[in-house]
A protein has these predicted regions:
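Terminal amphipathic helices with adjacent charged low-complexity linkers/tails
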Residues: 66-69, 278-282, 290
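Conserved acetyl-CoA-binding loop-helix of GNAT-fold acetyltransferases
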Residues: 374, 380-397, 405
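Short amphipathic alpha-helix that is part of the acyltransferase structural core
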Residues: 229-231, 299-330, 440-443
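Conserved catalytic-core motifs of GNAT/GCN5-like acyltransferases
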Residues: 404-406, 415, 420-443
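Nucleotide/pyrophosphate-binding catalytic subdomain
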Residues: 1-270, 309-314, 347, 360
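A conserved beta-strand-loop-helix scaffold within acyl/acetyltransferase catalytic domains
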Residues: 330-374
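Conserved N-terminal entry element of GNAT/NAT acetyltransferase domains
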Residues: 287-309, 449
Length: 449
């Protein structure tokens, strides 16, 4: 059993390493719905947030308190009142909000202070700091409704928050703001988190919500044919949002989506809607290729491009397992660095998941495609075909008639994509001299002109 565990753990941990490097030093604003805390999810969320901070991420945590305030209002015999999806905060509601905020901040700080041995928080030294970082203004009267002590964010103390983050602390914000005259306003977690993310130009805005994400057809019921859309380019998200009814409660598809769109339009690279009821969803989204929930991004994260010298380490990491098992011929770092411009790569969120190299033989009007590799984590998603097509385009643009590959294990994959098997004697003289007759690679050719 220990050997099996170790065997599974090592490749998984290696696959996570690129994301650890990618996110180190980045700033994430995380909004946790009050419903998550009411559902008893705070302890696990605190552990996950402590973990990502220990790996170098700067975290701003904004908590909600909608159900907690409602519970206190009902206990006092008052019915919670809303309009346009926003609470109408009278004097009683303001008192309840202040009391709920104080209690939740106490619980959150306590969760980050636990460090018992043999627990996920063992040895952690998480400093949680709060402050009057939000200046607010009143909502006022909208469509004849006086929102009283409900407010909107007027200004974010960016310098103060960054100073606290650079000190190594996690910033904790309640959905409260104060006017220049000292008047308190009840805000929403979603608006505070979005405003802070925009002001900081954070790398990520993340909502831990009660919904699993945005479905491809939001108005249709859950089904196998209507799964969660894991990645929404900003333009698609805007179009989708325009066709959704105005949200009145957190379970509405547009409730979080509107804030994600706003953040991405104003400089936040990526915004996420994650389900808090899935244990570890925050870690799955940040440190896995496919993630969980829905991400709104201002451009398609996955890019197909030619490699540069900066990509050498990523290419080496991708092809190394295939060199070890004999699928690929071993190449030295020096060779790959020298030939970096020959490679085409698929990069997703800063990590290389597929590559191939093109080595022309102009005198024979052909070129070798070498080191075609797709990460096991994304195989079966068409990345191999995309890289192959790019190599074909590059060969055609160079005025060549064909491309060829040498393979010992993947002949049928190439045959299905238009390659024909030929004798090794077909190879250009310069390549034939380097042919390894002991390896006995199959030679396959495809016309591109």
């Amino acid at each position: 059993m220990p050997n099996t565990i170790n065997t599974n753990f090592v490749p998984w941990f290696r696959s996570v390493a690129p994301y650890i490097h990618l996110h180190r030093g980045k700033t994430f604003v995380v909004g946790i719905a009050g419903e998550a805390i009411a559902a008893g999810k705070l302890q696990h969320l605190a552990q996950d947030l402590a973990l990502i901070q220990s790996m170098g991420v700067k975290v701003v945590l904004v908590h909600g308190f909608r159900p907690q305030v409602n519970e206190q209002l009902l206990a006092k015999g008052h019915t919670p009142r809303y309009s346009h999806g926003m609470r109408i905060t009278d004097e009683v509601a303001l008192d309840c909000a202040q009391e709920a905020a104080g209690q939740l901040r106490y619980e959150i700080e306590a969760a980050f202070s636990q460090g018992l041995p043999n627990t996920p928080m063992a040895g952690s030294t998480i400093r949680v700091m709060s402050g009057n970082f939000i200046t607010a203004r009143p909502v006022g009267i909208v469509d004849g409704v006086d929102f009283q002590h409900s407010g909107l964010v007027r200004k974010v103390d960016t310098a103060g928050i960054m100073q606290t983050l650079n000190f190594g602390a996690m910033v904790l914000l309640s959905p409260f703001g104060f006017s220049p005259t000292g008047e308190a306003f009840n805000l929403t977690m979603e608006e505070v988190a979005t405003s802070v993310a925009i002001a900081l130009q954070a790398d990520k805005l993340i909502f831990m919500s009660e919904i699993p994400g945005i479905r491809m057809q939001p108005n249709e019921p859950e089904s196998e044919d209507n799964p969660i859309d894991t990645e929404l380019p900003l333009a698609v998200a805007e179009k989708l949002l325009a066709n959704l009814p105005s949200p009145t409660q957190p379970s509405d598809a547009a409730f979080y989506l509107q804030h994600c769109v706003k953040a991405c339009k104003e400089g936040v690279e990526r915004s996420h809607i994650l389900p808090f009821d899935v244990d570890g969803s925050l870690l799955l989204e940040i440190y896995m290729h496919d993630g969980i929930g829905t991400m709104v991004v201002d451009e398609k994260l996955e890019s197909l491009r030619e490699a540069t010298a900066d990509d050498v380490s990523g290419i080496l990491q991708l092809i190394e397992p295939f060199e070890k098992d004999g699928t690929l011929v071993k190449r030295s770092p020096t060779e790959i660095e020298r030939d970096a411009n020959n490679y085409s790569i698929i990069e997703h969120d800063g990590v290389i998941f597929a590559c191939a190299a093109l080595y022309p033989y102009p005198e024979a009007r052909t070129a070798e495609m070498a080191a075609l590799t797709v990460s096991p984590h994304v195989q079966g998603q068409g990345d191999g075909e995309r890289v192959l097509k790019r190599i074909e385009q590059r060969a055609k643009a160079a005025g060549l008639d064909s491309i060829f590959v040498l393979t010992t294990r993947t002949m049928h994959w190439f045959l299905k994509r238009g390659f024909k098997q030929v004798d090794p004697d077909w190879l250009p003289d310069a390549r034939k001299r380097k042919y390894n007759w002991d390896r006995k690679s199959q030679v396959l050719v495809k016309k591109v002109s």
